[in-house]
């Protein structure tokens, strides 16, 4: 699909930088470039060759010195003729260059329109288009590696393979409807269907872990006032994000920041100490703390290594009873000797588990002040959120939309297999097989409507 118009946008982030790039794509990209860019050395444009010159306005006045490159379609990201102009990275300069492109006949691009053209022109499928956005928004190296693997096409290839496994049984079913006197060997239907079901189930099983790597999880720090929750937040973030003082009750509201814990982007929520109070501001902070506990995927119960449980701890510990919880024994820098730390951990674990009524999922000793134990804490949080397995060659389904569509495909394929084994008529088998193939098409983009495409690409930035 080739578009009649040509689009342009700034492809670099807003603000000052070393360079700014204006991207132009469409059938008139080269003619627009020739109108607004004057190379130092005249001559015909050769694709994929960078040229030095100046961007000029309609009167021939120089706007900025620049480097420009022309990429002829379909050997470009959008599969259309594409131009990129690199200029100095000041916001005003880049905006002026864009305005020259628009004045020369380009249209301002919509969010994600370059990537959408790449998809609609067959350059990439929808899984790869979504992976492009995931690369931009990745918050950990693991999430980035998963997105790059998906952009590389592993999921596209696997779904084409599964689709082919479903096409042959569908062809047999269609033939039997038209020519019922023909015979089909059972293995010609059962073998590929069984393989398709197994492959779809395998993909869906990876999604729980993959989605956490991509979207992250929520962990809430809870504990009595002055247990060191804010200090621990700062230590995990490696910045002084929360105000820390020796005065109990310094934190009056919830505070959220994202940390990379064991390769997982975890939204950490620091909370006000949960205590009874007549202060209306403090009571509001406590209520928000309770809400943060309810929304958390994991709780981090912070206690002081140099103190013992008190009555106020009962209510706090009760909030953790139905949630996965790590008991964090903080301030171990105040305890002399490794043996004493172990004895302290053993005592506090027993005491707080007696209050809780059920064991904690893990107990970790840390010092927010010195950093001792923080790496182990990060690894423990990641293990509890993900399980013990690690990504296999980056092959995890990371998108909720993909998971849901593939789960439906697996259900339809399984129903078709069960129906075949029970001798159900071919026309009914074909219904489930077609539904499974269409569900796979929702993932790759072969069976999606304009509304879904708009929803996906509108999340991209302008210029991508």
UniProtKB/Swiss-Prot annotation:
Binds 1 potassium ion per subunit. One of its GO terms (molecular function) is metal ion binding. CDD domains: trmE, TrmE_N. GTP binds at residues 226-231, 245-251, 270-273. Mg(2+) binds at residues 230, 251. Its EC number is 3.6.-.-. Its main location: cytoplasm. It is found in: Cytoplasm. (6S)-5-formyl-5,6,7,8-tetrahydrofolate binds at residues 23, 84, 123, 464. GO terms for biological process: tRNA methylation; tRNA wobble uridine modification. Its cofactor is K(+). It holds the Pfam family MnmE_helical. Keywords: Cytoplasm, GTP-binding, Hydrolase, Magnesium, Metal-binding, Nucleotide-binding, Potassium, tRNA processing. GO terms for cellular component: cytosol. Residues 216-386 form the TrmE-type G domain. InterPro entries: G_TrmE (IPR031168), GTP-bd (IPR006073), GTP-bd_TrmE_N (IPR018948), GTPase_MnmE (IPR004520), MnmE_dom2 (IPR027368), MnmE_helical (IPR025867), P-loop_NTPase (IPR027417), Small_GTP-bd (IPR005225). Gene3D superfamilies: P-loop containing nucleotide triphosphate hydrolases, Probable tRNA modification gtpase trme, domain 1, tRNA modification GTPase MnmE domain 2. K(+) binds at residues 226, 245, 247, 250. Homodimer. Heterotetramer of two MnmE and two MnmG subunits. Exhibits a very high intrinsic GTPase hydrolysis rate. Involved in the addition of a carboxymethylaminomethyl (cmnm) group at the wobble position (U34) of certain tRNAs, forming tRNA-cmnm(5)s(2)U34. Belongs to the TRAFAC class TrmE-Era-EngA-EngB-Septin-like GTPase superfamily. TrmE GTPase family. This is tRNA modification GTPase MnmE. It comes from Roseiflexus castenholzii (strain DSM 13941 / HLO8).
């Amino acid at each position: 699909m080739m578009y009649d118009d040509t689009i342009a946008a700034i492809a670099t982030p807003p603000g000052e930088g070393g360079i700014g790039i204006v991207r132009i794509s469409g059938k008139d990209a080269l003619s627009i470039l020739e109108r607004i860019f004057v190379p130092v050395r005249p001559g015909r444009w050769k694709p994929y060759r960078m040229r030095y010159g100046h961007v000029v306005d309609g009167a021939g006045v120089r706007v900025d010195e620049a480097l420009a490159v022309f990429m002829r379609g379909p050997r470009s990201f959008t599969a259309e003729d594409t131009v990129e102009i690199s200029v100095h990275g000041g916001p005003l300069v880049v905006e002026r260059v864009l305005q020259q492109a628009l004045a020369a006949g380009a249209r301002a691009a919509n969010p994600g329109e370059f990537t959408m053209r790449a998809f609609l022109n067959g350059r990439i499928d929808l899984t790869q288009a979504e992976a492009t956005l995931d690369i931009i928004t990745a918050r950990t190296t693991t999430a980035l590696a998963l997105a790059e693997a998906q952009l590389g096409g592993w999921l596209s290839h696997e779904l084409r393979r599964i689709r082919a496994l479903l096409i042959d049984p569908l062809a047999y079913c269609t033939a039997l409807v038209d020519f019922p006197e023909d015979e089909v060997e059972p293995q010609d239907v059962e073998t590929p269907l069984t393989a398709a079901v197994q492959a779809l189930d395998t993909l869906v099983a990876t999604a729980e872990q993959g989605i956490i790597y991509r979207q992250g999880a929520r962990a809430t720090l809870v504990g009595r006032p002055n247990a060191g929750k804010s200090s621990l937040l700062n230590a995990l973030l490696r910045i002084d994000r929360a105000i820390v003082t020796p005065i109990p009750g310094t934190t009056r509201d919830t505070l959220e920041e994202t940390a990379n814990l064991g390769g997982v982007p975890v939204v950490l929520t620091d909370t006000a100490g949960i205590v009874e109070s007549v202060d209306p501001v403090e009571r509001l902070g406590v209520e928000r703390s309770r809400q943060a506990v309810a929304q958390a995927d994991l709780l981090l119960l912070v206690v002081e290594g140099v103190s013992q449980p008190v009555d106020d701890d009962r209510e706090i510990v009760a909030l953790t009873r139905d949630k996965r919880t790590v008991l964090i024994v903080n301030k171990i820098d105040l305890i002399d000797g490794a043996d004493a730390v172990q004895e302290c951990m053993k005592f506090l674990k027993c005491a707080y588990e007696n209050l809780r009524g059920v064991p904690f999922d893990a107990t970790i000793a840390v010092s927010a002040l010195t950093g001792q134990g923080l790496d182990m804490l990060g690894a423990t949080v990641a293990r509890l959120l993900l399980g013990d397995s690690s990504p296999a060659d980056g092959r995890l389904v990371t998108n909720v939309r993909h998971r849901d569509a593939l789960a439906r495909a697996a259900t339809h394929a399984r129903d078709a297999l069960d129906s075949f084994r029970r001798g159900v008529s071919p026309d009914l088998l074909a219904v489930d097989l077609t539904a499974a193939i269409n569900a796979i098409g929702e993932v790759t983009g072969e069976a999606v409507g304009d509304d879904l495409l708009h929803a996906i690409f509108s999340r991209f930035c302008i210029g991508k």
